[in-house]
Amino acid sequence: MVQLAKVPILGNDIIHVGYNIHDHLVETIIKHCPSSTYVICNDTNLSKVPYYQQLVLEFKASLPEGSRLLTYVVKPGETSKSRETKAQLEDYLLVEGCTRDTVMVAIGGGVIGDMIGFVASTFMRGVRVVQVPTSLLAMVDSSIGGKTAIDTPLGKNFIGAFWQPKFVLVDIKWLETLAKREFINGMAEVIKTACIWNADEFTRLESNASLFLNVVNGEKNVKVTNQLTNEIDEISNTDIEAMLDHTYKLVLESIKVKAEVVSSDERESSLRNLLNFGHSIGHAYEAILTPQALHGECVSIGMVKEAELSRYFGILSPTQVARLSKILVAYGLPVSPDEKWFKELTLHKKTPLDILLKKMSIDKKNEGSKKKVVILESIGKCYGDSAQFVSDEDLRFILTDETLVYPFKDIPADQQKVVIPPGSKSISNRALILAALGEGQCKIKNLLHSDDTKHMLTAVHELKGATISWEDNGETVVVEGHGGSTLSACADPLYLGNAGTASRFLTSLAALVNSTPSQKYIVLTGNARMQQRPIAPLVDSLRANGTKIEYLNNEGSLPIKVYTDSVFKGGRIELAATVSSQYVSSILMCAPYAEEPVTLALVGGKPISKLYVDMTIKMMEKFGINVETSTTEPYTYYIPKGHYINPSEYVIESDASSATYPLAFAAMTGTTVTVPNIGFESLQGDARFARDVLKPMGCKITQTATSTTVSGPPVGTLKPLKHVDMEPMTDAFLTACVVAAISHDSDPNSANTTTIEGIANQRVKECNRILAMATELAKFGVKTTELPDGIQVHGLNSIKDLKVPSDSSGPVGVCTYDDHRVAMSFSLLAGMVNSQNERDEVANPVRILERHCTGKTWPGWWDVLHSELGAKLDGAEPLECTSKKNSKKSVVIIGMRAAGKTTISKWCASALGYKLVDLDELFEQQHNNQSVKQFVVENGWEKFREEETRIFKEVIQNYGDDGYVFSTGGGIVESAESRKALKDFASSGGYVLHLHRDIEETIVFLQSDPSRPAYVEEIREVWNRREGWYKECSNFSFFAPHCSAEAEFQALRRSFSKYIATITGVREIEIPSGRSAFVCLTFDDLTEQTENLTPICYGCEAVEVRVDHLANYSADFVSKQLSILRKATDSIPIIFTVRTMKQGGNFLDEEFKTLRELYDIALKNGVEFLDLELTLPTDIQYEVINKRGNTKIIGSHHDFQGLYSWDDAEWENRFNQALTLDVDVVKFVGTAVNFEDNLRLEHFRDTHKNKPLIAVNMTSKGSISRVLNNVLTPVTSDLLPNSAAPGQLTVAQINKMYTSMGGIEPKELFVVGKPIGHSRSPILHNTGYEILGLPHKFDKFETGSAQLVKEKLLDGNKNFGGAAVTIPLKLDIMQYMDELTDAAKVIGAVNTVIPLGNKKFKGDNTDWLGIRNALINNGVPEYVGHTAGLVIGAGGTSRAALYALHSLGCKKIFIINRTTSKLKPLIESLPSEFNIIGIESTKSIEEIKEHVGVAVSCVPADKPLDDELLSKLERFLVKGAHAAFVPTLLEAAYKPSVTPVMTISQDKYQWHVVPGSQMLVHQGVAQFEKWTGFKGPFKAIFDAVTKE
């Protein structure tokens, strides 16, 4: 057990730290703070903790006579830290008669400590407070120092006071119930204090990280009985005693630091702001990422960024930055906002650069507009004794991954610099392998601290190859080797990023690893690029030698599984070494541990990079094993059995490849650079770069055994190198390329060409480096020629010819391909652009992308370039890649034959305005119009699949971002390569849509289709094989049932068009802002309910599918239900709900696998809303949230048992949880036990307005809550078999109740005009009012005087609710309107008067909506961009028709009329963008090339058509034959029901015709919604209007 420790602060020993010190805590408070009243304050979460209950009971039992104990409980979470909660607590204290001697005891985390401390500071002008922190963060930070505060709506901690507590009593035992993430969160502050003040404690923390993470990862949930209430509570539990000593020390040491700093600077005037290390940048991230990210997580990121800033200034060494980053990762904290797990946790929120800087400007350390940041000098010490001023330019650089390199203008020609590159990556990795296999201790100095070596160190540790520790403040790594005997298989895959060296070396090492009782293999894996890089020759050799290895993904690349129960036999091993020398080194280093001595023969030609093999052999010699080179057989080596003996010290030589960059800088800028620790004795081939490349190009070279100095010639005078074989130094060829780019000579025939050969292996490095250099040099205006094993660079005639990379849209970035050497090379060339311009001439910088990739070998390269070599750098918000700037991600449609791909692909292209390509047709074009069937007969299926894959990859590469619809062959998923391409496209944001239908229907169709090659096997077998592939490759899915009638076909088209618009974001899913409802379906199968679905949804903005009620949960069945619902309801938004049993539904609580599958079906089907229960496991919640796409998430919680009153903390906790998940709507359903529960609910609703909230009570007692709920109230229908929850009402019932309460005022509405005796408006609107239970009345007001309408209705009727205006008043009424909509202005008439209140009125025109919606409802797409429109007639309605066709996207609108002279003034009065073309002669129609697919007839219906007009009309009707959809004509007149225009269009030219009655009802329904806020029940209204 640990001892009680007391820590002084401000001269008093008031901080007590111990474990299980409840008795000491009570005794200390009562003895040293005597009082008549003690008030314990905590939140409801803590009330569930047994240790808290024990403390309260003990406190009560120990009270002296005359004293009392009060307890006050607040809701958990930051929302309680408010003025309101403070006032409530103060009122409680006053009511309880508390006086000046009161002692407040704050037991809790930072929220409780801050708020109770502030109450204590102001109550009775200040009473005593004792802090009892229960979270790690509160223990080491917020409870110490006397800072107290509450939040305001404008920011956190804006109102507060310094008020020192009488005691801070820290009991480690509280941490037993701290949630894992909160525990880790607190570690950020612990690491911070060690980092700024206590290097020894930092080292101790490093060595105990794995213990800590093992313990907190073992957190469990346990059920406990509450000693105060006897209720059963569930709390988390961590075995603190398993790491008690470590936890106690980390808390104590962190507290000591803060106490010492506070004692020196209580009011935060200077020294105390050192405690803000990591907070300047961390707080900026927190401001954006809250509440998803916790304070400590953001501070962790801030610490790394601020440490990088210090390194950038040349103050902090790269080693120290690496240590800080490593320890934060080791304790489970994020070090970058871009980490995958952290991005998912923070729901992929963006952190824009300008917002971060703006947030940083609001920092108490700042002085005015100048920002200040704490700068670290080394681990355990800050630079200076307070924060330092930093510029926005430097901050921008640190905060982004894109850097702007300005011209190297201000660098003096006589500049001389000494640069020491980091340790060699090649030597570092070899040294780690050799020391791990060796026996004894080896101190490795100048080890490269990079991503590569970090992965290697982690792997050695995980495989238990050696014990690793650090000395010299982390500069020296101490490897205690165990001679290979302890190597053991680990369960987790070893992730190696893009570390090629580590992957090759560890593959052979894996052959020496021993199995454990539970683990018989290890897995090596890496990032996406690593999984493309070759490793096959090495694997082939090891397999041939007895090691069992499997590829887990791509043949020939990681990931691989190495079985540890196979053996590394030894003997003769043959290896192909023409691709990578690392294969050779890998086997060489492990060979002494084989069962027999090894003879390693390199076969297949001259080995690549032989100097690296020599390096390995020399290093093995240092570790005690001598390799003998054969004298009789070329490239063959003998390695004896044995084991390495570790030298006591091994110093890593600086990386010679990295040294080429500062040396090339000298060459290019005409300055001098010395690298003091690489000379001609170096083990590394790249050490000869200065001598063999730069010297012949015109540089002065001085090279000793251990140093190299380069002095460049005057800028612009470098000479090209006619030929250089860079095989001994292949990695340096990139540096040579950028030097060659600005090299030229006086020979006009040389073309300034530098020829580099011997570098074929560079095509399979981090990227294809030869291609990368050629591609990026071209952006600077430099031409290249690719050679079989090299490259020619054709230098520019003048350095002034270098261009800033750009395209037609402006500057573009230099891509680095996640390759450190590409990035560092181009950082040099970037600075030479415009470097010779006049000094005061403004020069654009060059943008380098993904600068962090240099971390692989030289994390501090940019710092050296900036701080030591004098380059001006800046950071910038990432440019959207030019290819993505106007990106319209293409749609790929996959599915079985006969699924409807051809038809639906056409619909898709039409709906989105995309181009359509059928890949089978493209195949035939590329194969001389040979059909697929013929090709298969002649060449076989395998060859066809290869060609199909090639074509698919090509079109995606070239047109994936350009707005295409690609219709594929049914078997595209048969090829593994095609499947990968499909998945890659989907993961890059593309749409891969699986189209499917009932397999039985498909079989029937396919058996009768002779046009395609026959299936070799049964159709059902094909489907069974492909079904999983279709699902795996697609990110969206649409069920397209077979249609037997044209009406069904058109309904399916409308349904699909809305679906595709929704998933692509063209159609935005809106959360209703006003009163709205959704109906809850409770059918087990919708197939037989299609007729009822429309009336069931009357008055609703959405419909809920209770999936847990469905007959089965198969993907096909559920998708079919969604399809039926969409078709039947004209795609009313769907709420997809799977209600679990514990939340009142039918779905089994623990069936998480099926639940995941159902959510996947929902998201692929593009449902508008998905109900996500807040009680589900966190991983499921985050999975759904991060995959939601355009679907809105409803976070729901139901209390069916009535366990929680609305003022219970359960609801507050759940609301905070919903905020953290960033759901779109919160849905809470309680149970009303009595009427007062409704009042409590309304108070909750009133205080929770920062998210749309659905909050209702169940049971009949809760009906009133449903009436008062505003957004998406759940309702039932009389046509449903039963309601989904007790107490549900219909829309009509709710509206009637709301009216009776005064919520809806009865309105009187009228149709006005003359004559109106036959007007159908009253029956239209009154039908809707009756169905929806609205109290309004619609009547006729017949008059030809607009003045009378104003006097009697607008001014004279206090209940006036609106007017439908007809002839002759549509123009006259406009003078009395206070506002006009755009439609009313353009159409030039008002048919709808909308009251705005205060005797103000808005004039609108819904005729165009009547036309538009009638057309869409009859199969016309919502966007018809590739089709022209036609209007017949030039009267008043024609203006509305033209407006409607323009809104549909018609690229041209033709208009014909009996009197052609009326056309010109009509066209001139309308906007030019309508692109209206008046047709005066029949002949001109023949010249029109456009397809005409949509028309509106606005001519009188009761007279025959004029012959000339009829002739023009018929010529246009012919043009409908090739429209992308069924050509459709709307008749604007609703009497008679069939007009002459309708007859000729339908009977003679097969146009689909829409009667005027539909326009009438659609425009009326549009009015209905504008007046009432409710969607009119269209079908019922239409039937009522047309029944006579």
Curated annotation (Swiss-Prot):
Region (Shikimate kinase): 890-1080
Active site: 268 (proton acceptor), 283 (proton acceptor), 853 (for epsp synthase activity), 1198 (proton acceptor), 1227 (schiff-base intermediate with substrate)
UniProt region (Shikimate dehydrogenase), positions on chain: 1306-1588
Localization, UniProt: Cytoplasm
CDD domains named among the record's database cross-references: DHQase_I, DHQS, EPSP_synthase, NAD_bind_Shikimate_DH, SK
Catalytic activity reported: 7-phospho-2-dehydro-3-deoxy-D-arabino-heptonate = 3-dehydroquinate + phosphate; 3-dehydroquinate = 3-dehydroshikimate + H2O; shikimate + NADP(+) = 3-dehydroshikimate + NADPH + H(+); shikimate + ATP = 3-phosphoshikimate + ADP + H(+)
One function term, GO molecular function aspect: shikimate 3-dehydrogenase (NADP+) activity
Positions of region (EPSP synthase): 405-871
InterPro entries with a match to the protein in the record: 3-dehydroquinate_DH_AS (IPR018508), Aldolase_TIM (IPR013785), Aminoacid_DH-like_N_sf (IPR046346), DHQ_synth_AroB (IPR016037), DHQS/DOIS_N (IPR030960), DHQS_C (IPR056179), DHquinase_I (IPR001381), Enolpyruvate_Tfrase_dom (IPR001986)
Main location: cytoplasm
UniProt keyword terms in alphabetical order: Amino-acid biosynthesis, Aromatic amino acid biosynthesis, ATP-binding, Cytoplasm, Kinase, Lyase, Metal-binding, Multifunctional enzyme, NADP, Nucleotide-binding, Oxidoreductase, Transferase, Zinc
Residues bound to 7-phospho-2-dehydro-3-deoxy-D-arabino-heptonate: 125, 141, 147, 157, 189-192, 258, 272-276, 279, 295, 364
Binding of Zn(2+), residues: 189, 279, 295
Cofactor: Zn(2+)
Binding site for ATP: 895-902
Renumbered residue ranges of the record's region 3-dehydroquinase: 1081-1293
UniProt cofactor note: Binds 2 Zn(2+) ions per subunit.
Annotated binding of NAD(+), by residue: 43-45, 78-81, 109-111, 114, 134-135, 156, 174-177, 185
Gene3D superfamilies documented for this protein: 3.40.50.1970, Aldolase class I, Dehydroquinate synthase-like - alpha domain, Enolpyruvate transferase domain, Leucine Dehydrogenase, chain A, domain 1, NAD(P)-binding Rossmann-like Domain, P-loop containing nucleotide triphosphate hydrolases
Function of the molecule: The AROM polypeptide catalyzes 5 consecutive enzymatic reactions in prechorismate polyaromatic amino acid biosynthesis.
Family recorded in the similarity comment: In the N-terminal section; belongs to the sugar phosphate cyclases superfamily. Dehydroquinate synthase family.
UniProt name for this protein: Pentafunctional AROM polypeptide
